[in-house]
Amino acid sequence: MAKEYSRTQRIGDQMQRELAELIRREVKDPRVGLVTITAVDVSRDLGHAKVFITVMGEETPDAVQQSLKALNSAASFLRLHLGRSMQLRSVPQLHFHFDESVSRGVHLSALIERAVAEDRLHKDTDEQDTKE
């Protein structure tokens, strides 16, 4: 039976769970808002991990940058705790990035809703024109 996930995917998934808990429990920096870890991409050699986050509530570019700065400065602290909890021989270096897919998805949903509303409006005006 073949493995469903590669080792890097399994480690990335576990890192995502562990980091979410560590950030919630251990990081006391006020610059870190309500952070959600959306994905962790681990390199094949397990040397680096890109941690993608979203910041709930405060979605201004300044708030996002402050959260990223705080998390990147706490990366070595988080890496140390990850090493203890995950029992890996070498823990990847953490690089935090803002995940724009959520905001892009919200923007696309708004565009779709607006297009549907305009289509309904045109349909209603066309029906009224044909009745007259």
UniProtKB/Swiss-Prot annotation:
What the entry lists under HAMAP family is as follows: RbfA (MF_00003)
Q: Which GO terms describe its cellular component?
A: cytosol
Keyword terms, alphabetized: Cytoplasm, Ribosome biogenesis
Top-rank lineage group of the source organism: Bacteria
Cite the GO molecular-function annotations of the record: ribosomal small subunit binding
NCBIfam families from the UniProt entry = rbfA
Q: How does it assemble?
A: Monomer. Binds 30S ribosomal subunits, but not 50S ribosomal subunits or 70S ribosomes.
Q: Name the Gene Ontology biological process terms.
A: maturation of SSU-rRNA
Q: Which organism is it from?
A: Pseudomonas putida (strain W619)
Q: What is this protein called?
A: Ribosome-binding factor A
